[in-house]
Amino acid sequence: MSAPSLRARAAGLGLLLCAVLGRAGRSDSGGRGELGQPSGVAAERPCPTTCRCLGDLLDCSRKRLARLPEPLPSWVARLDLSHNRLSFIKASSMSHLQSLREVKLNNNELETIPNLGPVSANITLLSLAGNRIVEILPEHLKEFQSLETLDLSSNNISELQTAFPALQLKYLYLNSNRVTSMEPGYFDNLANTLLVLKLNRNRISAIPPKMFKLPQLQHLELNRNKIKNVDGLTFQGLGALKSLKMQRNGVTKLMDGAFWGLSNMEILQLDHNNLTEITKGWLYGLLMLQELHLSQNAINRISPDAWEFCQKLSELDLTFNHLSRLDDSSFLGLSLLNTLHIGNNRVSYIADCAFRGLSSLKTLDLKNNEISWTIEDMNGAFSGLDKLRRLILQGNRIRSITKKAFTGLDALEHLDLSDNAIMSLQGNAFSQMKKLQQLHLNTSSLLCDCQLKWLPQWVAENNFQSFVNASCAHPQLLKGRSIFAVSPDGFVCDDFPKPQITVQPETQSAIKGSNLSFICSAASSSDSPMTFAWKKDNELLHDAEMENYAHLRAQGGEVMEYTTILRLREVEFASEGKYQCVISNHFGSSYSVKAKLTVNMLPSFTKTPMDLTIRAGAMARLECAAVGHPAPQIAWQKDGGTDFPAARERRMHVMPEDDVFFIVDVKIEDIGVYSCTAQNSAGSISANATLTVLETPSFLRPLLDRTVTKGETAVLQCIAGGSPPPKLNWTKDDSPLVVTERHFFAAGNQLLIIVDSDVSDAGKYTCEMSNTLGTERGNVRLSVIPTPTCDSPQMTAPSLDDDGWATVGVVIIAVVCCVVGTSLVWVVIIYHTRRRNEDCSITNTDETNLPADIPSYLSSQGTLADRQDGYVSSESGSHHQFVTSSGAGFFLPQHDSSGTCHIDNSSEADVEAATDLFLCPFLGSTGPMYLKGNVYGSDPFETYHTGCSPDPRTVLMDHYEPSYIKKKECYPCSHPSEESCERSFSNISWPSHVRKLLNTSYSHNEGPGMKNLCLNKSSLDFSANPEPASVASSNSFMGTFGKALRRPHLDAYSSFGQPSDCQPRAFYLKAHSSPDLDSGSEEDGKERTDFQEENHICTFKQTLENYRTPNFQSYDLDT
């Protein structure tokens, strides 16, 4: 029974005794009527001879009465007829007792509740305990309208069925009956008044739902019944209950919410039951609980959040249970706890922070447990108990006390270490407990060496001799002597009988399923038997596989070294923890450091990313998950790197708690191989998934109608986009296109080229593109106009119409020249150029081989890539060709086995630019213009007729040729005669039809738009010995497929007039770039070095100054 309840009961008994004595005093002051002495009061209040009168109490108990004594005095207010043999009460015998209030009929032979007649209405207390009453009938009680206390204990009542009548009852005692069942609603009529209900010592095995609808009830006792399970909401309706006692019921299970509704309950006693666990489920709703008594149960576990709903708890009794460990969450939330009793358990493990939250704790009882290591090895096990006053560690098998064992107990006043065979205490182990008033210590096992010298003096200084009974066990000379009887000089260190750790176990990592060992060694000078133990996470390993060895440290020595090996086989994740060896003998125990074991497992995929094909604009979802130990980290890569287009555009999402990788609004550039990598300390694995994006066909360039003159080449564009790349098909006038030898297709049918167009070619051309996602169609209208008649004078400036006719001529001449003479011309030029510059060129190398095989017009954005140049291996493999890009990609001329040059269908795309009047910046008459390293058309002489090159080529250029990048200069010289120039050209073995073309071209040099110019002869060299070489395709100055023109920078303020004589002009040719037509302007006025005249040959300079229009600026073109 708790102290508060005892105090309350004692106070009640004291008040009752005072009242009785007061009434007795008043009775005695008026005379002793029961003794027959004369008195006025006694004469008025006669007392039966068989009874005793004490105030208003008539005590007729223990008289073995079979019937009531008559007559009963009318003044009686309290009548005690207990312990008699009454079996029947006449109502008439009490009818005159108008003052009667209390009747006690305990321990009689009544079988029913007696009828007391008219006085029943005045009775407030009726005690019928210890009778033979078998049932409670409402009609027997309905007359007791003033009844407040009814005691029916120790009767034969077995059922509570018929509801109680509506009485003013406050206290109802039904203890020690035979009640086995209760009818719900049995006490409902007492709901407004009943305060205390006791049903102890019955045979109740279950409490029906809604049994207690007693909102005023404050105390309910159900001790010593047979209640095994308590269901949820069992006590609903007892909102005012202050205490509930269910001791000795054999309760094994408390369901969640078992005490819900008892929000005002302060005391819960569940002692002597069979509970095994404390959980927050059955404590739910006990918000005001202050005392919880759970002693004498079988509790072995406290759940981490058990105290969530009862944080006002001030006293907790867990004595005599089966607790073996106190975790850091065992008492979490009990900041108001004042007293904690955990004595007589099996506690052998206390976490470092087990008591950290008990900031208000004043009494901690841990007696009779097994927590020796807490004091011996742990540092600050009681830290956080700032207000602790009383600590009981009696009977815990403590053998040694370290210096920091009681760290944090600054306010401790009472420390009980009795019944512990303590062998050693480190110096100043109690020094920080400044307020200590009592230290209880009794041991006869002390190792009285130099380390114990401080203890007797400290005990004497603090006047603890009356509480300390300590004697020595070693050395043999001091055995059995009290420490207070040993002089300070008697505490010496001649040996070390207590084991000392010499080899500490080491921290290790292991792969799951492998075997490993921990090794620990200690030395001792004693021959006392050694015991070895291993702990994991401060808990003893009972079934550990150990190997123990002993050997002398040195020959002839007296020091023994002991080694223990802990073997762990097929380690699992549960094997992880901190391992510690404990080596002990009769003189104490030594604890090693704690070695940590980490168990790793290689990652393995539980979810592997799968190849995904998805439409553009949709959301891509890639899953990847892996398991391992430690948990692996998941990382993603795209195409072997971390450059995600979706990440740059913030379209990529990776959920940290999820296994999914998202890309929203998928685009073509998201196509690639995505790699998922799972990595931990044991290793890494990866898995790949290919993302394919599908896009419906679309036109990357608008379809433009074309108008050409009869005989010209017509180029129709249909630049297609989509994924997978769409297939193209051309139709004419909604009918299949009849393909003739004049029809050519290029770039995957994206270009339709019609050579020598005829009026019959005019019409509506439909481009149909299709892939797996759909089909798209577009129309292009081709108009062919008849050949106009134009008589333009030779010496007049050409108009835009003249230039159109010139374009037609260029196309015709380009085709003829390419088929007949191009191969021979370039072979001759390249061969002699290489021989001329072989000595001054830089060393060739074959190590540079840049790819030039990606057509830029196929980019997914639908725009052309930047100009790309590169080198490709020549056919012979000994040299490289310099290759410049055109709008349609990189092009090389194709030769058949006879050396004949064929038209490259891909390069026909540039024909369009050549035939577009607004894309040709070079107007006026032209002449042959050659410079080594410059860029020219596919036919060396097309420029003569057109003023611009449809498909430029690099002339006489070796790879990395110095002359390509060096400064070219122009020198004044005497004008050679027409014959000398003609003779210079005639030295070359031209085909007859080419020679005719050259002669015709040369005759134009007399026009007003031409000036003779002499160049360094090294710039051009013709030889009759051809050498097989490849000629690289280069970029045009004109844009293709809408690409920006690569025009030279023009001088907006260039002069209209040019000097008639040749002024020195210099310009630079940069690698992989077009010639800068005005670059020489920056070098005007500087000196040049003249070459000898014999090194000069004849060339021409084109001027456009006489034909400047508002749309085209005039400038000089040096080539």
From Swiss-Prot:
Domain Ig-like C2-type: from-to ranges: 499-598, 603-692, 697-783
Residue stretches making up the LRRCT domain: 444-495
Free-text tissue specificity from the UniProt record: Widely expressed.
Glycosites: N122, N156, N274, N442, N469, N515, N688, N729, N905, N987, N999, N1016
Entry-linked InterPro entries: Cys-rich_flank_reg_C, Ig-like_dom, Ig-like_dom_sf, Ig-like_fold, Ig_I-set, Ig_sub, Ig_sub2, Leu-rich_rpt
Cystine crosslinks: C520-C581, C624-C676, C718-C767
A GO cellular component entry from the record: plasma membrane
Superkingdom, natural source: Eukaryota
One GO term of the biological process aspect: otolith morphogenesis
Chief location category: membrane
Gene3D superfamilies from the UniProt entry: Immunoglobulins (2.60.40.10), Ribonuclease Inhibitor (3.80.10.10)
Record-annotated LRRNT domain positions: 38-74
Locations listed in the record: Cell membrane; Cytoplasmic vesicle membrane
Pfam families according to UniProt: I-set (PF07679), Ig_3 (PF13927), LRR_1 (PF00560), LRR_8 (PF13855)
Topological relation to the membrane, as annotated: Single-pass type I membrane protein
Transmembrane segments: 810-830
Keywords on record: Cell membrane, Cytoplasmic vesicle, Developmental protein, Disulfide bond, Glycoprotein, Immunoglobulin domain, Leucine-rich repeat, Membrane, Repeat, Signal, Transmembrane, Transmembrane helix
Region (Disordered): 1073-1093
Signal peptide (UniProt feature, chain positions): 1-24
LRR repeat feature ranges: 75-96, 99-120, 122-142, 146-167, 168-189, 193-214, 216-237, 240-261, 264-285, 288-309, 312-333, 336-357, 360-382, 387-408, 411-432
Subunit structure: Interacts with EGFR, ERBB2 and ERBB4 (in vitro).
Function: May play a role in craniofacial and inner ear morphogenesis during embryonic development. May act within the otic vesicle epithelium to control formation of the lateral semicircular canal in the inner ear, possibly by restricting the expression of NTN1.
Protein name: Leucine-rich repeats and immunoglobulin-like domains protein 3
Organism (species): Homo sapiens
Gene name, Swiss-Prot/TrEMBL: LRIG3
